[in-house]
């Protein structure tokens, strides 16, 4: 069964449906990710004219014509209607083509491959800002197997996604249990400033023995810093069980993390705290509170500065939390740690699904060639 070569322009229709009747509001506004997904928008649209937003119905595709290293693209697999700013380009697979030539789900798998982003970059134009427009999309060539083979490999992909989503739903249930305990404590207990339980560590790497350099991201994780410095002497040490945070703030998403790995060093933009008595307060329990959005709002309110916002140790120490019996803390921390481990597994499942997309496309082409 031979493969058939097309250019995408033969298979796609551009979507020019706008929200001119204002049927859809701010709750329908979405954005796209360069990981090829649709997400809640990160910017305020309260002052925007929603009548000029593009309407994307189930089965529709959307992409941002401004490009970085990857194309921001999404596929509406939900039963909901979304709207996007007119900075985006929307399209559908032509109905007659979707029946017998190209499944929209198969096209989405094709987009998920890293090969697509590499080819897309080759087709971009611009200097300071790269662009990939509708005409560029239509010029792309695609080899397609028979529709029955497409259905087979789409079914494999959907089964993997369904398994991951089922796992994710259980993950959110676990988080609800943890959040429920936290909220119940806050209602029933008097809160105390964390300054009563913590101290500020100022231990320096004076002898240069620690060479593991780390940074912290807004996902509350230690990471390898983007910029490295070979001079390890005099850097701030973070011991296992201590908490480090970035004193410079851009917004309420503070970079803070509990060190669970080996001792490391961080740059001078970080402060380090330790628990004075772990029979009264567990670092894992404290970290649960420092991971909550309300803590981000607190530090943004408590920070100081003009051009840059800074969080001092004194302001941090004023944050109040309920501090229950240590056994209650252990129980809550155990549930939360289970949630964190499962969240990491869920991210691994997502990565595996994305990694298998090139294999699925290749497998479908090889099966078609053999038929």
Q: Language-model segments: which ranges?
A:
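Non-catalytic DNA-recognition/assembly elements of restriction-modification systems
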Residues: 1-19, 139-206, 216-217, 322-371
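A short glycine-rich beta-alpha junction/loop motif
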Residues: 82-89, 125-148, 264-271, 304-330
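Short, solvent-exposed alpha-helical surface patches in well-structured domains
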Residues: 106, 119, 139, 149-152, ...
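Sequence-specific dsDNA recognition surfaces
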Residues: 5-61, 196-243
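Non-catalytic, surface-exposed connector residues within folded enzymatic/regulatory domains
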Residues: 23, 100-101, 131, 280, ...
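A short beta-sheet element
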Residues: 58, 63-112, 244-291
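Internal, well-ordered alpha/beta segment that forms a basic, Gly-enriched binding/recognition surface
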Residues: 116
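Alpha-helix initiation and N-capping motif
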Residues: 5, 104, 191, 266, ...
């Amino acid at each position: 069964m031979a493969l058939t070569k097309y250019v995408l322009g033969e298979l796609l229709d551009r979507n020019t449906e706008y929200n001119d009747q204002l049927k859809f509001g701010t709750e329908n506004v979405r954005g796209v990710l360069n990981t090829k997904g649709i997400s809640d928008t990160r910017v305020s649209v309260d002052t925007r004219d929603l009548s000029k937003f593009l309407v994307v119905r189930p089965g529709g595709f959307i992409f941002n014509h401004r490009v970085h290293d990857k194309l921001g693209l999404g596929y509406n697999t939900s039963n909901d209607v979304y709207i996007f700013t007119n900075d985006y380009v929307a399209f559908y697979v032509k109905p007659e083509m979707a029946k017998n030539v190209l499944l929209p789900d198969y096209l989405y798998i094709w987009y998920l491959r890293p090969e697509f982003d590499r080819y897309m970059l080759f087709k971009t134009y611009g200097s300071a800002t790269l662009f990939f427009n509708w005409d560029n999309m239509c010029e792309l060539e695609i080899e397609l197997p028979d529709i029955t083979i497409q259905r087979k490999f789409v079914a494999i992909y959907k089964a993997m996604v369904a398994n991951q989503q089922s796992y994710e739903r259980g993950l959110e249930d676990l988080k609800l249990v943890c959040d429920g305990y936290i909220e119940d404590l806050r209602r029933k207990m008097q809160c105390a400033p964390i300054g009563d339980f913590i101290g500020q560590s100022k231990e320096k790497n004076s002898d240069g023995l620690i060479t593991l350099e780390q940074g912290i991201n807004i996902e509350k994780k230690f990471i390898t810093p983007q910029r490295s410095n070979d001079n390890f002497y005099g850097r701030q040490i973070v011991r296992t069980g201590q908490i480090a945070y970035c004193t410079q703030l851009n917004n309420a998403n503070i970079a803070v993390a509990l060190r669970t790995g080996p001792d490391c060093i961080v740059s001078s933009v970080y402060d380090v705290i330790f628990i004075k008595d772990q029979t009264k307060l567990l670092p894992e329990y404290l970290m649960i509170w420092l991971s909550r959005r309300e803590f981000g709002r607190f530090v943004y309110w408590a920070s100081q500065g003009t051009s840059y916002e800074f969080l001092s140790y004194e302001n941090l120490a004023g944050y109040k939390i309920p501090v229950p019996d240590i056994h209650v803390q252990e129980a809550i921390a155990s549930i939360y740690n289970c949630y964190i481990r499962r969240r990491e597994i869920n991210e691994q499942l997502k990565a595996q699904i994305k990694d298998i997309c090139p294999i699925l496309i290749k497998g479908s082409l090889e099966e078609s060639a053999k038929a």
